[in-house]
Curated annotation (Swiss-Prot):
Cofactors demanded by this protein: K(+)
Top EC category: hydrolase
Function: Exhibits a very high intrinsic GTPase hydrolysis rate. Involved in the addition of a carboxymethylaminomethyl (cmnm) group at the wobble position (U34) of certain tRNAs, forming tRNA-cmnm(5)s(2)U34.
PANTHER family (alphabetical): TRNA MODIFICATION GTPASE GTPBP3, TRNA MODIFICATION GTPASE GTPBP3, MITOCHONDRIAL
NCBIfam families: mnmE_trmE_thdF, PRK05291.1-3, small_GTP
Subunit structure: Homodimer. Heterotetramer of two MnmE and two MnmG subunits.
Matching CDD domains: trmE, TrmE_N
Protein name: tRNA modification GTPase MnmE
Amino acid sequence: MVFDTIAAISTFPGEAGIGIVRLSGDDALEIISKIFKPYKSKDIKKVKSHTLHYGHIVDPETEEVYDEVLVSIMKKPNTYTREDIVEINCHGGIVVTSKILELVLKQGARLAEPGEFTKRAFLNGRIDLSQAEAVIDIIRAKTMLANRYAQKQLVGYVGSKIKEMKDKIMGLLVHLLALIDFPEEDVEELERKEILETAKEIVEDIDKLIASSESGRIIREGLKTAIIGKPNVGKSSLLNALLKENRAIVTDIPGTTRDIIEEYVNVKGIPIKLIDTAGIRDTDELVEKIGVTKSKEVLAEADLILFVLDASRELTKEDYEIFDILTGKNIIFVLNKIDLPKKIDEKELKDLTKDGIIIEVSTVEKIGLEELENTIYNLVFRGDISLREDEIVINSRHKEALINAKKYMESCVEAIEGGYSEDLITIDLNAALDQLGKITGETATEDLINEIFERFCVGK
């Protein structure tokens, strides 16, 4: 494909030690030759690929020196975009990088759209669409675990699994077309049995990938963990203790937290989305009532609940009412304020929690917090919450395409078992291929491709 030459600032626009202005396209070398004065006189267009050159960026019209720089020259096809790429490594900050970018645009480059460098890598065949999405996941990764999964996707783990399934489907199509062209009754019966078995295998393969979508959501968005309890049991104090900073207001006045507070914390590599909720109780105060309603909505969506109880007080009607709405949830009972004289009835608590997980903590004295973090980690990796370290995870877009592909493959299985003609069976197989192609990009629409790359930042 032939594209124009694009340019953008690829680094953070604020104050920094280094800034990078990136160019990609057929005119990248010509443009840099006009504005770059190497320390040792040389034709920058003729230097070896993947080399670094010291010099200055100079306005060719005014001869004003813009900055002292290092210029990276990377020639096609062995580059990120499979086009000629130039990266100008200059001093950081808004002024210098903006002036250099302006000069580059003046020489004929166009300002890149969000994600356009990676989009060109996809359109030029260097990566598939799932790998392009992995670039976004790497940029947005909140923990090393999230980064590790994204890196697996970037090197093609998802694409390779999809290719395996597509190859199997293509094999089935070849067999079916052969049966259509050369029908022999004895051979046909044997072939249809083999085709049926392979079709069922593909359904199982798709199911395995679909099952990993929940892990993918947790890794990308964080384990939704709601901190709940009646007012003034220490929910906000627990949030602050886990964050190791004062994010929520802590007072002795019940009902202080009116809004839902969301923060991310890294618990042993797992991204945890902590949600501090308003204390759940009956109230006539309008604003607090809205907060309680929001808290109940959060409960319905949470992957894990930290139910905070006050060890220095007896269980109350409010505690029991909260217990009643927690059926079917992953719960850790957090017994707070153990630094104070204990008044809670432990036998009553154990009966109520049905031998659930109880962790004793003091957010004031920082007791039990590490045990709580270990418990969350163990819940995740022993399988109580859907996440395994060894699986390939997919995103919601992949899941939708896989669900559709599975539907067509199941229809294919039914058609084979029902003795339908080979022509009808191939329709379902081709439809399944089309859905799988949406994941890696071969059959993705232009609108879908644009939508994905619009999520990128400019310069990537």
